[in-house]
Amino acid sequence: GLQPGHHHPLPAAGAEVLEGGVTRVMKEFKLRVFRYDPEKDAQHHYQTWTVDYREGMTVLEALLWVFEKKDPSLAFRYSCREAICGSCAMYISGRYALACKVQVKDALEGDTVTVSPLPHMRVIKDLVVDQTKFWENYARVKPWLINDDPAPERERLQSPEDRARYN
């Protein structure tokens, strides 16, 4: 038992506190991934790997671990790894998410993380979907600033007055 003045230490990330204060640290987990190769498969299936867990590991890092250590045929997209570009958008354990942002510990269902491609999009291979319609709509919407004036030779600086208007 604890002596007066002593406290239970906080469990490490990836640790689970069981009954009686016993701590179990996660060393590995199962990654269940949607697989489909139109050149080989009549229909999709799921494949599961046991992955070595590391504190703070993201789902993207788990996919890269599988690609590098277990199966270099696994297909998925990623780019910035900073939750900005959206390239690694997937359906992770029942929710839409960016694989580079979601930590494994937050996506676990029991001891398993399930990863599927975005629904309602044609699957090219595994987790890679056809984004043609998305990019067509993106270009149609033009989600960028359109300038009526020619570009200046120097950058445009925001005045303190302009800045104050936006605060």
Language model features with spans:
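Low-complexity/repetitive intrinsically disordered segments
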Residues: 1-2
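Signature of N-terminal electron-transfer/Fe-S-associated modules in redox systems
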Residues: 5-10, 21-167
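Charged/polar low-complexity intrinsically disordered segments
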Residues: 16-19
